[in-house]
């Protein structure tokens, strides 16, 4: 506080002595002592302007007495114009003398905060003089209707515009001894505005009170004054007159703006151009200039809007800082009180009763429980509820799994193709051929593992090891001898000698198996290989039945996926060609001949897959 001084710009401009104070006063704003000289310099040019204006008026009067009558006439006109401008400037200065910038208007005490109210919904087109005229008329009407002789007046006011068409007016009333006059005035103004809003929809002004002011008024409110309809009509007529003046001024301004765009091009400057091109050129010039003026208007409106947003953001920062400082002061005060209470407890522990200690302990426990509750509530909102929502979404997806799977079937098939689930098949088509070639090389080098060495029986007959393994051995057979026999067969080409009982069992099984094979061969009809391949090659369906089966095959998109698998892209024309070939020829060989031209060796694989589909099977 030692580095802060309180100053009043109004008193300084009126050259009064008490414009500076070390303590807070009504209408004074706090500044740093280091900024005092800067404050005086900023207001000094206003005083110099007033002095120069007075000297100009005096000099013009002296010059008027010297010149002749003709010159006096012209000078009188100039003096009248200058005097009129001076009077209008003085009126504006007088009418806006109670207006303060928003930073200077901020209340610095609780009394100023209580006596500050706001009007919302005031048109942004109202000038400062019109706003003060409206405020004075409203205040005089309220004091008259409430029959109050109080010296209540508007001490200062400011405005803040968050939109382009409306603004908020902040009003600070002077503090008077009669609180009843201030309370009755606010109640009457609030009732007056509400009554007019019910009658006229174009009247948007509303009185807004801060929380402290609202409680202050409610505690001191007796009977709410009634509003007479004729008084409301009188105030509304004043409001409409001000609004009409504003509309007239805006219309003149619009006409001036229109005149800046509606102009004629001087064709004399375009004399060197052909006459048939002048009309179009003039239109282009007017259109271009109109476009430029419109862009400038839009930029101006945008800058106005951005300025209002910036002011609003600045106000929000100021209010947040005030709130932060206020809460910080309260927190420091509470901390000091707690420290003081702890010291008092240590000093007066013997004298303080147990009831007060228990009460204080309960309060601390309550604060701790409230803090834990807030932490748990934050945990619920930040972690638990999002997890529950995610689990519910998973449950709903699981309940409708089949429907979801069927709906996105094509996407999943594409995902299987693009994400390379089968790496060797998708990216290495020759992998199967390489494996087959390696298997043949291994068989040529190491022999075929399926063709085991034959087992020589004791009676001179030979049987393969596979058949010998399939024979069920009788009970009592020596396992060790069988193990040695198998070992000898796998490791060397020596003949294995088997016991007589084992020989009998093997001979009996060989005879029975040969009889079964002969019986099966006798039952099967003789079929030529050419007839069998021809039957497999042709489709045994009628034309209508084949069309139905081809339609089902087309709807399953199996042929599309085959083409996509071997070509890498979808080809609808190729799919139609394949289906048409099957419909016309009904032959696997004819289809294979056509596919080899496009797919080479893969054509045989495609034909085999198509002929193995259920659509081409009998009984399906």
From Swiss-Prot:
Swiss-Prot/TrEMBL keywords: Coiled coil, Cytoplasm, mRNA processing, mRNA splicing, Nucleus, Phosphoprotein, Ribonucleoprotein, RNA-binding, Spliceosome
Coiled-coil intervals, chain numbering: 296-385
Compositional bias (Basic and acidic residues): 246-256, 356-373, 431-445, 517-537
Subcellular location: Cytoplasm; Nucleus
Keyword Methyltransferase (UniProt): no
GO function terms (MF aspect): RNA binding
Pfam families: SNU71_N, SNU71_RBD
Predominant location: cytoplasm
Top-level taxon in the UniProt lineage: Eukaryota
Assembly notes: Component of the U1 snRNP particle, a subcomplex of the spliceosome.
Protein name (database record): U1 small nuclear ribonucleoprotein component SNU71
Organism: Saccharomyces cerevisiae (strain YJM789)
Gene symbol of the encoding locus: SNU71
């Amino acid at each position: 506080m030692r580095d802060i001084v309180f100053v009043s710009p109004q008193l300084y401009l009126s050259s009064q002595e008490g414009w500076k104070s070390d303590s807070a006063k009504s209408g004074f704003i706090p500044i740093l002592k280091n900024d005092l000289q800067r404050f005086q310099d900023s207001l000094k040019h206003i005083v110099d302007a007033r002095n120069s204006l007075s000297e100009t008026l005096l000099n013009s009067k002296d010059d008027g007495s010297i010149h002749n009558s003709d010159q006096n006439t012209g000078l009188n006109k100039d003096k009248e114009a200058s005097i009129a401008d001076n009077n209008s400037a003085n009126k504006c200065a007088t009418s806006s003398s109670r207006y303060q910038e928003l930073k200077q208007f901020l209340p610095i005490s609780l009394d100023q905060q209580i006596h500050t109210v706001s009007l919302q919904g005031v048109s942004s087109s109202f000038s400062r003089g019109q706003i003060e005229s409206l405020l004075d008329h409203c205040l005089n009407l309220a004091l008259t209707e409430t029959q109050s002789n109080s010296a209540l007046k508007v001490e200062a006011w400011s405005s803040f515009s968050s939109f382009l068409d409306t603004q908020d007016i902040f009003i600070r009333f002077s503090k008077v001894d009669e609180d009843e006059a201030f309370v009755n005035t606010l109640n009457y103004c609030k009732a007056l505005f509400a009554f007019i809003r019910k009658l006229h929809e174009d009247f948007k002004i509303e009185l807004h009170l801060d929380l402290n002011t609202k409680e202050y008024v409610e505690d001191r409110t007796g009977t709410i004054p009634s509003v007479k309809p004729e008084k409301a009509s009188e105030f509304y007529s004043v409001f409409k007159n001000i609004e009409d003046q504003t509309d007239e001024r805006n219309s003149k301004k619009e006409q001036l703006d229109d005149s800046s765009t509606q102009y004629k091009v001087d064709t004399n400057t375009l004399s060197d151009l052909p006459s048939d091109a002048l009309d179009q050129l003039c239109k282009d010039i007017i259109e271009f200039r109109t476009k430029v003026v419109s862009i400038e208007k839009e930029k101006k409106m945008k800058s106005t809007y951005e300025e209002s947003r910036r002011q609003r953001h600045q106000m929000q920062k100021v209010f947040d800082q005030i709130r932060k400082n206020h809460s910080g002061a309260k927190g420091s005060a509470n901390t000091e009180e707690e420290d003081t209470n702890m010291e008092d407890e240590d000093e007066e522990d013997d004298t303080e009763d147990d009831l007060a200690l228990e009460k204080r302990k309960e309060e601390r426990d309550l604060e701790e429980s409230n803090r834990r509750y807030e932490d748990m509530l934050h945990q619920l909102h930040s972690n638990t509820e999002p997890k529950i929502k995610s689990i519910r979404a998973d449950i709903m997806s699981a309940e409708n799994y089949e429907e979801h799977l069927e709906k996105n079937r094509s996407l999943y098939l594409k995902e299987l193709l693009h994400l390379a689930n089968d790496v060797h098949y998708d990216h290495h088509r020759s992998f199967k051929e390489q494996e087959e070639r390696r298997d043949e090389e291994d068989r040529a080098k190491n022999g075929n593992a399926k063709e085991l060495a034959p087992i020589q029986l004791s009676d001179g007959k030979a049987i393969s090891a596979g058949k010998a393994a399939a024979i069920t051995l009788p009970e009592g057979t020596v396992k060790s001898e069988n193990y040695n026999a198998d070992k000898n067969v796998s490791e060397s080409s020596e003949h294995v000698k088997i016991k007589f009982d084992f020989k009998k069992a093997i001979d009996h099984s060989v005879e029975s198996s040969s009889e079964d094979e002969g019986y099966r061969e006798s039952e099967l009809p003789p079929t030529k290989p050419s007839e069998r391949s021809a039957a497999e090659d042709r489709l045994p369906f009628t034309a209508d039945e084949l069309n139905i089966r081809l339609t089902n095959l087309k709807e399953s998109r199996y042929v599309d996926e085959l083409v996509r698998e071997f070509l890498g892209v979808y080809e609808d024309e190729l799919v139609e060609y394949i289906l048409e070939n099957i419909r016309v020829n009904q032959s696997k060989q004819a289809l294979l001949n056509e596919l080899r031209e496009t797919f080479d060796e893969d054509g045989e694989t495609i034909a085999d897959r198509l002929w193995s589909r259920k659509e081409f099977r009998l009984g399906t």
